[in-house]
Structure formats: structure tokens, C-alpha cells
Amino acid sequence: MGRKWNNIKEKKASKDANTSRIYAKFGREIYVAAKQGEPDPESNQALKVVLERAKTYSVPKNIIERAIEKAKGGAEENFDELRYEGFGPNGSMIIVDALTNNVNRTAPEVRAAFGKNGGNMGVSGSVAYMFDATAVIGVEGKTADEALELLMEADVDVRDILEEDDSVIVYAEPDQFHAVQEAFKNAGVEEFTVAELTMLAQNEVELPEDAKAQFEKLIDVLEDLEDVQQVYHNVDLGE
């Protein structure tokens, strides 16, 4: 758990700033979550998670509202949730989550991204067993001890609490995402620096510089694909 979540978020946001691609990806994810359940986050937990994540990336309100209104309006555009697994340079492990309205387009694009950048796509289950689904919540203005105390008082179980720069990062089971946030909100916390549901590698590996450069290019190419929502990996990039 050595990665710095605020650094990762800032790097991702800056890379996507010119194209607003990150907003488009959130728009798609919000639409799908709202369409699959109620368009009200209070009665749709999946939508609530996406909206909390969107807040930490400062996704504009109009994009959020447009996606929810599109779902309310009964739009017929349907998306499939897909997960691809594969290997990067030096046997590094990668999971790719996608939302697509054309499966026949997405799979070849992901496979090509792997193949052209020193990797190869694996079969389902080939790397996922080395990752744990995890809720990651970050707050400022609290110490790890203070966070632990308020979470214990709220009877919320977490895996770990780490201090990172000016933030405290809480790792918990995915189904504790809202419980962790509510515990902090009840303690006066109004904003979260990190709010993610992620696949966390059980063990991170370091790559030599040449393989690391190729790996970073592979991740960039995968993240730039229109249908790809999230890319998870087990490489320590020094973030």
C-alpha cells in the first residue's frame, strides 16, 4: 500500500485535463449506474459511489446532471461492464475495467494495446487473484489515531489506516465505502481527498527503467481508450 493516492489522482487529472476525457468517462459511468437502478443516489448505492468519486475529481455539475437526466429520459443506449486481465513488461499484472456499447470494438482495442506495448492479454482470472477489491477513502485534517478512534466509535471495520502527506488514507472492504464516509461526515469532515473503489495489488513489484518506461506507455495507451474506465496494476511507479 505504498502508493500515494493524491499523487496518482493529480497525475491522472493533469493527463486528462486538455481533453476532458476523465469527465467523459465519469459521464458514462454515472449514466450506467443511474440507468441500472434509480436515478437517485440515496436509493442507488452504485450511483452514490460514482458521484462521491466524481467529487474528488471536480467533475462539473452540468456533466453529472446531464448523465442522470439522460438515464431518467429512458435513453436506449446500453453498456456492458467488461473486465480484461493481462500482463505487461517483465510479467507485471494489469486489470482493465471497461464500459462499452460495442464489445466487438473494445476487446480488439485492449488486446492491441497490450500487444503493441510489450504485454499480452490473459484469460479471465489470470491475474485478478493477486488483487483485492478495496475501498480507499482519504481525508485531511485528521491523524491516523483520530481516524481510528472515530471509525471504532462508529463501529466501522477497516483494513488499514495510513498517513500520507497531509491526508489520512483508510483502506476497507468495498461494502464499507459509505460507512467509512458517513463516520467521517458525522465527525465534521465535508470533503474527501480520495474516494475510490479499486483493485489493490497484494504485492507490488519494481521494474528496471527500460521496462518501467514501456509499462507506463502501456498504461497510458490503455487509459486513453474510450471504453476503458479503470486500469489497475501491481507495479511500484514511485508515486
UniProtKB/Swiss-Prot annotation:
Alphabetical list of Pfam families matching this protein: TACO1_YebC_N, Transcrip_reg
Localization, UniProt: Cytoplasm
UniProt GO molecular function: DNA binding
Keywords: Cytoplasm, DNA-binding, Transcription, Transcription regulation
One cellular component term from this protein's GO annotations in UniProt: cytosol
Single biological process term from Gene Ontology: regulation of DNA-templated transcription
Family indicated by similarity: Belongs to the TACO1 family. YeeN subfamily.
Organism of origin: Bacillus velezensis (strain DSM 23117 / BGSC 10A6 / LMG 26770 / FZB42) (Bacillus amyloliquefaciens subsp. plantarum)
Record-given protein name: Probable transcriptional regulatory protein RBAM_007230
Lineage: Bacteria, Bacillati, Bacillota, Bacilli, Bacillales
NCBIfam families the record matches: PRK00110.1, PRK12378.1, YebC/PmpR family DNA-binding transcriptional regulator
Entries under InterPro entries matching the protein: Integrase-like_N (IPR017856), TACO1_YebC-like_2nd/3rd_dom (IPR048300), TACO1_YebC_N (IPR049083), Transcrip_reg_TACO1-like (IPR002876), Transcrip_reg_TACO1-like_dom3 (IPR026564), Transcrip_reg_TACO1_YeeN (IPR026562), YebC-like (IPR029072)
Keyword Membrane included in the entry's annotation: no
